[in-house]
């Protein structure tokens, strides 16, 4: 079930494949902020940047 999956991708081709399959995608690439990745669930330039975001404490619920 695509709604229960997450792809972490480092190429535009892989990003397109995941998007075509209806799978949420996080992009890790130097050009991740490029407009072609705007539909990504997350965009990071490096793996450490993603790992830092994942380890951050979530904001308190209001």
Q: At which residue positions do the language-model features occur?
A:
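Asp-based, Mg2+/Mn2+-dependent phosphohydrolase catalytic module
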Residues: 1-62
